[in-house]
UniProtKB/Swiss-Prot annotation:
It comes from Arabidopsis thaliana. Transcriptional repressor that regulates multiple aspects of plant growth and development through the regulation of BEL1-LIKE (BLH) and KNOX TALE (KNAT) homeodomain transcription factors. Required for embryo development. This is Transcription repressor OFP5. Residues 37-48, 63-94, 143-167 have a biased composition (Basic and acidic residues). Plants over-expressing OFP5 show kidney-shaped cotyledons, round and curled leaves, small rosette size, late flowering, reduced fertilization and round seeds. Transmembrane segments: none annotated.
Length: 349
């Protein structure tokens, strides 16, 4: 039979053993859990510190790379600016030089068209050298020779005009591809043989006298014909060549021909003046045997600049035109390169 009531009391020994075991186990568990927690926290702290150090190192490397790239970019920009400035300066100087060269080439082409009949000086090899032409001041001997030639022409021309009663105005000699000019209008290496003013006046007076004589004869013949017609001869309504109108035309034509001849002589003088770059008319080309044409061209240009006091680009341009006209096409590139060097050395603006 079961008894209802209180439970049996537990013995004191068992209860004391449990009481001893329970606190120890709980403390050991608590201490174990407390020991585990700091270790985990330490690991987490170490990982966080490692991540932070990695991040800081990455950020520092990215900053350094950015700074390096920025410095490189700045250097590139500065170099590009300097290059663009030098390019613009070079371009400006090249444009100025090209402008000068284009005007010079145009003048040379115009001169070659107008003076295609200039006497050509053939290049000769002397001691394996090259013959070049440079402008110089003419010596007195050549000047005297040309003056004597002009005097002979002055003496010969009035005799011809007096002997030939029906003389006509002489047309200027045509210039052939390799031929020369007429004797009166010839141009020899920069010197022009021209007629003085008093000679032109004499020729003009002679021509006017001839025209007046012809007009008087025509008027007399016309008067005689009219008298014959009055007597009873058959009238003719056609305009005769002896009419005053025809004589007036002949007189005007003679004066115009004289003016044209004088104008041609003046044009030749102007051509030689422009060829000499504004220097004296009495200049000529010196034929020189050279083993180094480039050096000789440079020395000659510098000498001409110093002697004539050339200090403007226009005067230097005229000097270049003179060199290009005097020499053949094979030396033109060399002359232009030497001109560019001299232009840069003297710093013409």
């Amino acid at each position: 039979m079961m008894r209802w009531g209180r439970k049996k009391p537990v013995s004191s020994s068992s209860s004391s053993g449990l009481s001893r075991a329970l606190p120890v186990s709980w403390f050991s568990k608590l201490s174990g859990s407390s020991d585990l927690k700091p270790a985990k926290e330490k690991k987490q702290d170490e990982k966080a510190s490692q991540n932070i150090s990695v991040k800081t190192s990455l950020s520092s490397t990215t900053r350094r790379s950015d700074i390096h790239e920025n410095s490189k970019r700045f250097q590139r920009v500065s170099v590009e600016k300097e290059n663009s400035a030098t390019r613009s300066a070079d371009k400006e100087s090249n444009e100025k030089f090209e402008e000068i060269m284009s005007s010079v080439r145009k003048k040379v082409r115009d001169f070659q068209k107008e003076t295609c009949g200039f006497l050509e000086v053939e290049a000769m090899d002397r001691d394996n050298g090259t013959v070049i032409l440079t402008p110089r001041i003419q010596v007195n001997r050549d000047k005297q020779r040309c003056e004597r030639r002009d005097q002979r022409l002055l003496e010969q021309k009035p005799k011809r005009s007096e002997q030939d009663a029906g003389v006509k105005v002489k047309k200027p000699a045509r210039r052939t591809g390799t031929g020369g000019y007429s004797r009166e209008d010839s141009v020899i290496l920069g010197h022009t043989i021209t007629k003085p003013a008093h000679q032109w006046e004499k020729l003009k007076e002679v021509k006017l006298r001839e025209v007046k004589l012809k007009a008087d004869q025509q008027r007399k013949s016309l008067y005689l014909k009219r008298e014959l017609n009055r007597i009873g001869t058959k009238e003719n309504n056609k305009v005769r060549v002896f009419s005053p109108r025809a004589s007036e035309k002949c007189r005007v034509k003679a004066i115009e021909d004289l003016k044209k001849a004088k104008q041609r002589a003046r044009e030749h003088e102007l051509l030689i003046e422009t060829a000499d770059g504004g220097m004296e008319n009495e200049s000529f080309a010196v034929v020189k045997c050279s083993s180094d044409p480039q050096k000789d061209f440079r020395d000659s240009m510098i000498e001409m600049i110093m002697e004539n006091g050339i200090n403007h680009p226009e005067e230097l341009k005229e000097l270049l035109v003179c060199y290009l006209r005097l020499n053949t096409d094979e030396y033109h590139d060399m002359i232009i390169s030497v001109f560019q060097q001299v232009h840069n050395d003297f710093n013409f603006h």
